[in-house]
Design a protein with these regions (language model features):
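C-terminal substrate/ligand-recognition segments
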Residues: 18-56
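Amphipathic, non-transmembrane alpha-helical secondary structure
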Residues: 29-33, 37, 41, 72, ...
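Aromatic-rich peripheral "rim/lid" segments of glycoside hydrolase catalytic domains that contact
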Residues: 57-67, 73-77, 84-85, 91-145
Length: 145
């Protein structure tokens, strides 16, 4: 089922039960595959994904780490979509996660965090999140683990 929500920019239909990020954006990993396929069929150029990421409400746990399994799952699903494209000979030549470190989001301030590295805005201390180590392994081994 759907429900209609009104916003200043447009009317948006939200499917009930669809997973969403902390920014309330839908999580739609198949969209990356279909976008790569469409753009390749239309323009016949290689694809570089320059920004793909998920906002989350992250915090430092009592063990001093930042555990973000939702972000790992998000990236894993989107990379699987790109792998599907590569398997179909769509020329995907790059993928950049947004963002390496938590930062100031123009519309949301410091509440929502996109980074693979947690930033304590008071002390400027950086703490690599679980997703940082997972993504480093993906890059090192050139495969989704």
């Amino acid at each position: 089922s759907t429900r209609k929500e009104s916003s200043a920019a447009s009317d948006v239909y939200k499917r009930q039960g669809m997973p969403r990020t902390a920014m309330d954006w839908p999580i739609t990993p198949d969209a990356l595959y279909w976008a790569a396929r469409f753009l390749t069929e239309r323009y016949h150029l290689p694809i570089i994904v320059t920004e793909n990421g998920m906002a989350n409400i992250d915090f430092v746990m009592s063990d001093g780490a930042v555990h973000d399994p939702q972000r790992i799952d998000f990236v894993k699903r989107y990379l699987a979509g790109l792998q599907r494209a590569v398997d179909e000979n769509i020329p995907v030549i790059g993928y950049l996660y947004w963002s390496i470190m938590d930062n100031f989001e123009w519309a949301e301030g410091y509440d929502k965090r996109f980074g693979l590295v947690y930033v304590d805005y008071q002390t400027q201390q950086r703490i690599p999140k679980d997703s940082f180590y997972w993504y480093a392994d993906v890059i090192k081994n050139n495969r989704i683990s």
